[in-house]
Amino acid sequence: ADTIVAVELDTYPNTDVGDPSYPHXXXXXXSVRXXTAKWNMQNGKVGTAHISYNSVGKRLSAVVSYPNGDSATVSYDVDLDNVLPEWVRVGLSASTGLYKETNTILSWSFTSKLKSNSTHETNALHFMFNQFTKDQKDLILQSDATTGTDGNLXXTRVSSNGPSQGSTVGRALFYAPVHIWESSATVAGFDATFXXLIKSPDSHPADGIAFFISNIDSSIPSGSTGRLLGLFPDAN
């Protein structure tokens, strides 16, 4: 199975598998929900998620905010050296199930830094998408994810006339592997930001968007639509 660390913007409470009874931001390591926070998801409004981690504090933090100032914060103390392989890929994932929503990514940026004692070098990877083209060569698109419509990344499928569809899942990973940790590193860390628009015709939008870090050959587990957000093979 893939090794996944994720920050979920979970719009649908699957209380049968241990979700809180409201939309929430969650940090997940492997397939365990490590920490959750209540999130007032605003249907049809653009929200911004900012995720950060550094090897000194060993804390994965995320803030999801809206233009009206409403925000939710979740953080989890974790040493990524113990969880992830040294080289990883970063991506965005989303899914719908019985209920649906659009999972539109308007922009996405990422910066990682790895400072090593032995060589005094800093390895940094940085990318920024302020829009997505139809033929976006530096992204690996999986399953239903598409780019280019209105300059956006649509992580799940929408009909040609716009409405979201149910039981769809998609992911976009940056093509270049990221050196996320190294035993001799003095400082390792990253910052990621994405702006997303979740819009649903249903009174229950579902299921959510996640920023994730995985082994470089990660693929979408079969049957991971709905509550599994395209990340996990079973409902832990």
From Swiss-Prot:
InterPro entries: ConA-like_dom_sf, Lectin_LegA_CS, Lectin_legB_Mn/Ca_BS, Legume_lectin_dom, Leguminous_Lectin. Keywords: Calcium, Lectin, Manganese, Mannose-binding, Metal-binding. A carbohydrate binds at Y12, L98, Y99, R227. Mn(2+) binds at E8, D10, D19, H24. PROSITE patterns: LECTIN_LEGUME_ALPHA (PS00308), LECTIN_LEGUME_BETA (PS00307). Ca(2+) binds at D10, Y12, N14, D19, D207. It comes from the Eukaryota. Pfam families: Lectin_legB (PF00139). Signal peptide: none annotated. GO terms for molecular function: D-mannose binding; metal ion binding. Homotetramer. Belongs to the leguminous lectin family. Binds one manganese (or another transition metal) ion and one calcium ion. The metal ions are essential for the saccharide-binding and cell-agglutinating activities. PANTHER family: CONCANAVALIN A-LIKE LECTIN FAMILY PROTEIN, LEGUME LECTIN DOMAIN-CONTAINING PROTEIN. Glucose/D-mannose specific lectin. This is Concanavalin-Ma.
